[in-house]
Amino acid sequence: SHGEASAEELADLAAPRLDALLAQGVTTVEVKSGYGLSLEHELAQLEAVALLGERRPARLVATCLAAHIVPDEHKERRGDYVRLVTDVILPAVAARGLASAADVFCDEGAFTLAEAREILEAAARLGLRTRVHGEQLTATGVATLAAELGAASVDHLEHVDAAGIAAMARAGTVAVLLPGATTFLADPALPPVKALRAAGVPMAVATDANPGSSPTTHLWLMAQLACVSYGLMPHEALRAVTVVGARALGLADAGVGRIVVGGAADLVATDAPGWRHLLYGLGDNPARRVWIGGREL
């Protein structure tokens, strides 16, 4: 129908963004749905990810974020939309093999803690890995819930409390830091990196690439800003965009994000004079040559 993009059109629109990531040596990319908010449109977005995966050598991980916000037509009967997600959208996605994970945005203006639990439990029953966007705008306690339910990661975390940090540390839940969002939204609240570090919570960094709050595909800049704005140390930032990112996606055991015998052999060559320089020049893309699975792009 008019004004609605097909999976083919969505894949065409996404291709230049994926190419920008590949040019930086980003070989593994998570792509989320969440801008459809109906069965038909969520499936189209995830089908676009599958199409992209056929057209590009990148390793793509599809996540269904149907639980992004409650669409306007369901505002009066929120439970109806939660049930649409748990009983219709997620089962259809799982049955078609279109996503390996499900994500929920639990925050003010999005889903409540109780709704998040319903959606995460439904996803887990379907065999989907789970992740959460949360503690971004307000402290909800969803970090504790995510850890309890075995979610792979919690994104944002500007307002996570001590209990949430402790729970994530115990469960090994990855904290995904998103400096693009705090920068673009001019949010004075920053994630408590010192407390996360002290507790031993693994920290990843991502672009949060999206039109509303983080319009960027520059993962190097995000790693650089994580050092400048969030106080990560250079070695932490490098791990954050390699092995810890792979861990958040459930790929670390497959040797993604690391140079190991029998691993993925995704390699990036740079002419930077030393590894710290990778995190120094704001906006620099230090990648000069890129290999995925041992094959040069």
For each predicted feature, which ranges?
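Metal-coordinating catalytic core of metallo-dependent amide/deamination hydrolases
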Residues: 1-14, 19-20, 27-141
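Flexible loop residues that form catalytic
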Residues: 34, 107, 157-159, 267, ...
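Short coil/turn connectors at secondary-structure junctions
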Residues: 24-27, 55-60, 96-98, 171-172, ...
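Active-site-adjacent C-terminal substructures of enzyme catalytic domains
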Residues: 129-130, 139-258, 272, 282
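C-terminal cap of metal-dependent C-N hydrolases
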Residues: 241-243, 261-297
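Divalent metal-coordination and catalytic microenvironments
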Residues: 25, 32, 102, 133, ...
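Non-catalytic positions within long, well-ordered alpha-helices that form the structural scaffold/packing
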Residues: 22, 86, 94-95, 124, ...
